[in-house]
């Protein structure tokens, strides 16, 4: 079965066997010249077809078990697929095995999956009385509506799909959740069931193993266990509280970045948290981003709490006149921003309403875009290497709706391509995926579980400089508009620390660990020695704690190990008298002895090992 053709890829779309027949091609997909074959396997394009068909298999099974069920949409998403539906029956996680069993029953029945195309009038009549399908149709333009059928079940869908349910043998329903109709909180709440599907048994097995590993590494769980952060309902959803250890971790990353930024010619700036709505109207945020912003009124003047830092940095630029000799100007800020995220999408530190970006804006000439982006790519590589992340880049090009002329866009896009080429970076191209005001590069990191995360962005902006009428005096003494480059490498400290926590499973490397060394005095008489050593380590900028609880030595050591502290030092008579320390080193997975002075020199050196 692995060699069977299930669809083709042509003109950036997947065309399944049934769609080829509907197009009137008697030989099916074979008649589609210049197309790329898609075989039944675990490749990305094949999985899109497989998972889409598995979503329909889920809907068919739900209809069989709950005849009153009505269905909204069932798309393929990054984590598999889901279907939104409603029924008068109460459905819980405990019902998933029963639904899954029904899916397997239909899969074994080897039902042919067929397609027909209806006019809008025919589709409205076919799904008469189904308000959810009518809601779907209201969002579709044109007069061609695809309907896929299998074993008496049919659903409105554009595809692509497998030719038969016999292909669907390796799937799993993963969770049940609620979802508002169309993602709008004003609409009714539907039931959403998620699932995953693969062509092979190995693919499903590996994925389920990864899911279990991800549960163990969940940063929300680690945040509590390691005392990094918390949330409080009395404060509000999506508003994290950084506890001392989490704040230390974050500060260490901030300090390392600041040192590197200053060496790379960035200047620290700081903008206000609230700005008059007038500037948000100039920037376009008021018209295009208002629903994601918070507003307040002071002295009858409306203010917007900033969702982004760019406007503040523009005003810093405008605070003085600039010549071409001043450029590039690089401003950075650890900017706190607020965005109104719907409660249903909030997720630990990964999705919050208040977060801090490692934000920077570079004001430069067109000719400087390539060199500035090249420097950012170099910076990115050093940061990712320090944290043991592999990463990939994606270049997004001009969308259909955009500002600026073709030559300007081509020049800006080529500058990004040349910068990527200079660093020998293989990158994907998202044709038409850029913002309306300029091309961009997205930075996607891969963690220890092979999960990909969108973090940083390098965005060329030709819109805001025009809106705010930014200028510099060029070498011919004429006013010229600068280009603005938005740049965040981590994205936000909250999101990056969540990813970092799961990547290392809380075993943070020494240079950023929230507690780097713990000192365990065996008895009270060793406590003074521990405090003196603590002071020596603090002078060397080491985060150190003395564990002097009234517990047994073994219990204190186990507690320190559970806290995933890189180095544990047990201090007794021998260590105090000889000043030769006993060290338990987590990173080396070893125990060894070292003279005090040598140890102090070693940890001092370890703090210098990493730089960006």
From Swiss-Prot:
Zn(2+) binds at residues 310, 361, 486. Signal peptide: none annotated. One of its GO terms (molecular function) is metal ion binding. Residues 218-509 are annotated as: Catalytic. One of its GO terms (cellular component) is cytosol. GO terms for biological process: threonyl-tRNA aminoacylation. It comes from the Bacteria. Transmembrane segments: none annotated. It is an enzyme of class 6 (ligase). Its EC number is 6.1.1.3. Keywords: Aminoacyl-tRNA synthetase, ATP-binding, Cytoplasm, Ligase, Metal-binding, Nucleotide-binding, Protein biosynthesis, RNA-binding, tRNA-binding, Zinc. Binds 1 zinc ion per subunit. The gene is thrS. The keyword Zinc applies. InterPro entries: aa-tRNA-synt_IIb, aa-tRNA-synth_II, aa-tRNA-synth_II/BPL/LPL, Anticodon-bd, Anticodon-bd_dom_sf, Thr-tRNA-ligase_IIa, Thr/Ala-tRNA-synth_IIc_edit, ThrRS_anticodon. Its main location: cytoplasm. CDD domains: ThrRS_anticodon (cd00860), ThrRS_core (cd00771). It is found in: Cytoplasm. This is Threonine--tRNA ligase. Homodimer. Belongs to the class-II aminoacyl-tRNA synthetase family. It holds the Pfam family tRNA_SAD. Coiled coil: none annotated. It catalyses: tRNA(Thr) + L-threonine + ATP = L-threonyl-tRNA(Thr) + AMP + diphosphate + H(+). Its cofactor is Zn(2+). Catalyzes the attachment of threonine to tRNA(Thr) in a two-step reaction: L-threonine is first activated by ATP to form Thr-AMP and then transferred to the acceptor end of tRNA(Thr). Also edits incorrectly charged L-seryl-tRNA(Thr).
């Amino acid at each position: 079965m692995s060699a069977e053709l299930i669809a083709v890829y042509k003109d950036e779309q997947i065309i399944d066997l049934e769609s080829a027949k509907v197009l009137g091609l008697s030989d099916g997909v074979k008649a589609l010249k210049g197309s790329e074959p898609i075989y039944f396997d675990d490749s990305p394009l094949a999985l899109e077809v497989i998972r889409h068909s598995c979503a329909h298999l889920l809907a068919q099974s739900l209809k069989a078990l709950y005849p009153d069920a009505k269905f909204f949409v069932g798309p393929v998403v990054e984590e598999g697929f889901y279907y939104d539906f409603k029924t008068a029956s109460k459905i819980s996680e405990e019902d998933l095995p029963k639904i899954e069993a029904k899916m397997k029953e239909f899969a074994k029945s080897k039902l042919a999956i067929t397609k027909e195309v209806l006019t809008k009038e025919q589709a409205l009549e076919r799904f008469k009385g189904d308000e959810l399908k009518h809601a779907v149709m209201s969002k579709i333009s044109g007069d061609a509506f695809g309907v896929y059928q299998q074993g008496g079940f049919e659903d409105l869908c554009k595809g692509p799909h497998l030719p038969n349910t016999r292909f669907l043998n390796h799937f799993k329903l993963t969770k049940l959740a609620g979802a508002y109709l169309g993602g709008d909180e004003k609409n009714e709440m539907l039931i959403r069931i998620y699932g995953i599907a693969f062509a092979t048994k190995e693919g499903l097995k590996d994925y389920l193993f990864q899911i279990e590993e991800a549960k163990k590494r969940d940063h929300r769980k680690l945040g509590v266990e390691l005392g990094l952060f918390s949330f409080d309902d009395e404060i509000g959803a999506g508003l994290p509280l950084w506890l001392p250890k989490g704040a230390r971790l974050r500060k260490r990353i901030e300090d390392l970045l600041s040192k590197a930024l200053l060496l790379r010619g960035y200047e620290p700036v700081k903008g206000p948290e609230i700005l008059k709505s007038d500037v948000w109207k100039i920037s376009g945020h008021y018209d295009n981003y208002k629903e994601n912003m918070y507003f307040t009124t002071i002295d009858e003047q409306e203010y917007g709490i900033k969702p982004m830092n760019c406007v503040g940095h523009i005003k810093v630029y405008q605070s003085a006149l600039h010549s071409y000799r001043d450029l590039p100007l690089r401003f950075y800020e650890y900017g706190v921003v607020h965005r109104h995220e719907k409660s249903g999408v909030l997720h630990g530190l990964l999705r919050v309403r208040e977060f801090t970006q490692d934000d920077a804006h570079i004001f430069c000439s067109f000719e400087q875009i390539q060199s500035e982006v090249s420097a950012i790519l170099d910076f990115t590589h050093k940061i990712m290497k320090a944290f043991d992340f592999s990463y990939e880049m994606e270049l997004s090009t001009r969308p259909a709706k955009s500002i600026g002329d073709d030559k300007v866009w081509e020049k800006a896009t080529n500058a990004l391509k040349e910068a990527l080429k200079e660093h020998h970076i293989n990158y994907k191209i998202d044709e038409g995926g850029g913002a309306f005001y300029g091309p961009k590069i997205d930075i996607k990191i891969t963690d220890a579980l092979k999960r990909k995360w969108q973090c940083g962005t390098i965005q060329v902006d030709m819109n805001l400089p025009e809106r705010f009428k930014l200028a510099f005096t060029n070498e011919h003494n004429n006013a010229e508009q600068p280009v603005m480059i938005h740049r965040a490498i981590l994205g936000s400290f909250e999101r990056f620390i969540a990813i970092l926590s799961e990547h290392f499973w809380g075993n943070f490397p020494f240079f950023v660990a929230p507690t780097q060394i713990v000192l365990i005095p065996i008895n009270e008489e060793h406590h003074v020695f521990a405090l003196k050593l603590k002071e020596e380590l603090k002078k060397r900028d080491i985060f150190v704690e003395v564990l002097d609880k009234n517990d047994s030595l073994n219990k204190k050591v186990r507690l320190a190990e559970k806290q995933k502290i890189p180095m544990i030092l047990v201090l007794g008579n021998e260590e105090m008298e000889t000043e030769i320390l006993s060290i338990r080193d987590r990173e080396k997975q070893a125990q060894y002895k070292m003279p005090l002075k040598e140890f102090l020199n070693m940890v001092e050196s370890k703090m210098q090992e990493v730089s960006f």
